[in-house]
């Protein structure tokens, strides 16, 4: 069980690093990304749709990893 938790935590860290790198390449903050995703802000001209899609997919992967970790946490703490 703990090995699975360590693997998920390592994957979360990798995903976080990938997101940070993509945000730096696009000169965006995480807040900017969220605003663009919500439609509250226009996408900058220097960021193409394919790049934004890649960033969105990585954020979705991070969300899935966090959900998996939360699921394990709930399973461990129920007794």
Swiss-Prot record:
InterPro entries: DUF2443 (IPR019469), HP_1531 (IPR038018). SUPFAM superfamilies: HP1531-like. It holds the Pfam family DUF2443. This is Uncharacterized protein HP_1531. It comes from Helicobacter pylori (strain ATCC 700392 / 26695) (Campylobacter pylori).
């Amino acid at each position: 069980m703990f090995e699975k938790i360590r693997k998920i935590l390592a994957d979360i860290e990798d995903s976080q690093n990938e997101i940070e790198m993509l945000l730096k390449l696009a000169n965006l903050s995480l807040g900017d990304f969220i605003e663009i995703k919500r439609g509250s802000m226009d996408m900058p001209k220097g960021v193409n749709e394919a790049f934004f899609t890649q960033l969105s997919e990585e954020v979705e992967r991070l969300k899935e990893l966090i959900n998996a970790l939360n699921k394990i946490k709930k399973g461990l703490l129920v007794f």
